[in-house]
Design a protein with these regions (language model features):
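Local cysteine-cluster metal-coordination motifs and their immediate loop/turn environment
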Residues: 14-17, 53-73, 90-91
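A C-terminal junction/extension of Radical SAM enzymes
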Residues: 1-21, 53, 65, 114-124
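Short cysteine/histidine-rich zinc-coordinating motifs and their immediately flanking basic loops
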Residues: 69-75, 80-82, 100-104
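A generic structural signal for secondary-structure junctions
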Residues: 30, 38-41, 71, 75, ...
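Short Fe-S-cluster ligation motifs
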Residues: 45, 83-124
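C-terminal accessory region of radical SAM enzymes
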Residues: 17-61
Length: 124
């Protein structure tokens, strides 16, 4: 619940996929962004996002990367038959598992004080 959306007129919403009157947190012209992010409504929005994840997602090895993604995209069933699986789940898993070795190499470079961009020379 921390990726808010702001419209051109300053209206702020819980998420860019929920730009509906029900999810309007306020307007940046008359309410601080901090107030909106930390509002009870927004905290409940974020909590519901986590609380509605099916067990398949809660036990997933890449959940820390996608967090179940957007609730609007959770319209498939898990292999166990539970509702709430993100329709991009399989692609996310493939991407994160494919890119993990490169991410780990970049993290190792950072730990020794080198630029992660050096990985580009290693890949060439």
């Amino acid at each position: 619940g921390t990726a808010l959306a702001m419209e051109h007129n300053g209206d702020v919403y819980s998420c860019d996929h929920y730009v509906y009157p029900r999810y309007q947190l306020g307007n940046i012209l008359n309410r601080s962004l901090g107030e909106m992010v930390n509002s009870e409504f927004q905290r409940a929005f974020g909590k519901a996002k986590a609380d509605t994840l099916p067990r398949y997602c809660r036990e997933c090895e890449v959940r820390h990367l996608c967090h179940g993604e957007c609730p609007k995209h959770r319209f498939l069933r898990t292999p166990d038959g539970d509702p709430g699986l993100n329709y991009l789940c399989r692609a996310y898993k493939r991407f994160f598992n494919h890119s993990a070795p490169a991410m780990q190499r970049m993290a190792a470079l950072l730990r020794i004080g080198r630029a992660p961009a050096e990985i580009m020379r290693q890949a060439a």
